[in-house]
Design a protein with these regions (language model features):
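N-terminal secretory/targeting leader peptides
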Residues: 1-136
């Protein structure tokens, strides 16, 4: 999928409200499927295509059920945001020292997460090409 017309008539997992709106506007049918069910949905024909992070594309072995991959290298305007969440009630129940530790660890994970995602963005081409997918 490189241009809106590529989506027409396809069953696509968008993964977010905004992506779902774009898919619908382009003439695609949005199919809500959790990331961990994309593999079986692609295999069974419930989905024709899915949008998800490079990390998920690799870790869920989606190259086994696909023939094509549009990478985020030059065809993307978004980056997958994968936050670490904690309820306000749980956070407020921590001591100030514990809250400080949570914030410090969160900050260190942010850098790690961004770097790991960048590595996966580069690695995905290799994984999908090796599987015989056409990568653009």
């Amino acid at each position: 999928m490189l241009v809106p017309d590529d989506v027409k008539g396809m069953k696509v997992r968008g993964g977010s409200r905004e992506m779902d709106m774009m898919i619908k506007a382009a003439g695609g049918a949005v199919t809500n499927v959790p990331s961990n069910e994309i593999y079986s949905a692609m295999q069974s024909g419930v989905l024709d295509a899915a949008l998800t992070s490079s990390t998920s594309l690799i870790s869920f072995r989606l190259h086994e059920t696909s023939n094509f991959l549009t990478t985020g290298r030059s065809h993307s305007f978004w980056f997958m945001f994968e936050p670490l969440l904690m309820s306000r009630k749980a956070y407020d129940s921590l001591t100030p020292e514990q809250q400080k530790i949570v914030m410090e660890v969160g900050a260190s994970l942010e850098k790690f997460g961004m770097e790991a995602a960048k590595v996966d963005d580069q690695r995905i081409t290799e994984v999908y090409t090796k599987a015989g997918d056409k990568v653009v």
